[in-house]
């Protein structure tokens, strides 16, 4: 999706609305196209923000659940992440039976995974790239995060690309077209996955936004190619 025009394509995307996280709420009003070829995911703080409860903080999330799912392929986002402490932007995949209470605890990602293609934390110099597998229940989730030390600065106010290549044999992460990490050690998921584009509060340094302020995650495009070829 190149996010052209002024209306989000709801044939492809779902928009979370009136959903509550313990730190904030999701609102459809915080997801919109700017008419210049960008999707805006706005993080906003109302004038009546309550720091103790998180009431009055809003963000947006879009997903392709039940509208577009894919197995293997190449997944890429081009975006300017949030440039505010206390916030983070994310592009990720969720596939298989991760949310199934009976998900197999077999030490492999064959039956499902969550792939955080990128999570950007402004208070850190390096973004996060992580794979979770074996379900979310009964403390059986397994995770592997990859070192990003020495990567070029992504918090410069410019667009950057973040991608994930998923083949039957390997996972590979890329930033600005450069492979940053490869792995196959946890097994390769062979189940369809859907996409999520989201922005979040918390666990990202000191929260500095004040009532009435906002900070934007600016997305130029999200692209999926069936072939995971180099």
Task: Give the predicted meaning of each segment.
Residues 1-230:
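GH16 jelly-roll
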């Amino acid at each position: 999706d190149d996010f052209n025009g002024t209306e989000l394509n709801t044939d492809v995307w779902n928009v979370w609305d009136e959903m509550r996280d313990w730190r904030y709420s999701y609102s459809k009003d915080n997801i919109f196209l700017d008419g210049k070829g960008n999707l805006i995911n706005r993080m906003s703080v109302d004038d009546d923000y309550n720091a103790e409860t998180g009431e009055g903080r809003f963000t947006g999330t879009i997903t392709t659940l039940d509208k577009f799912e894919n197995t293997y392929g190449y997944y890429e986002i081009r975006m300017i992440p949030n440039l505010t402490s206390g916030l983070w932007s994310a592009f990720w995949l969720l596939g298989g039976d991760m949310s199934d209470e009976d998900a197999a605890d077999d030490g492999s990602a064959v039956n499902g995974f969550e792939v955080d293609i990128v999570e950007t934390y402004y208070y850190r110099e390096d973004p996060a790239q992580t794979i979770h597998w074996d379900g979310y229940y009964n403390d059986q989730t397994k995770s592997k995060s990859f070192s990003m030390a020495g990567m070029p600065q992504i918090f410069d106010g410019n667009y950057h690309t973040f991608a994930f290549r998923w083949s039957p044999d390997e996972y590979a992460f890329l930033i600005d077209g450069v492979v940053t990490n490869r792995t196959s050690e946890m097994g390769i998921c062979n189940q369809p996955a859907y996409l999520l584009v989201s922005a979040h509060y918390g666990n990202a340094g000191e929260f500095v936004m004040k009532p009435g302020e906002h900070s934007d995650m600016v997305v130029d495009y999200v692209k999926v190619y069936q072939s995971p070829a180099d």
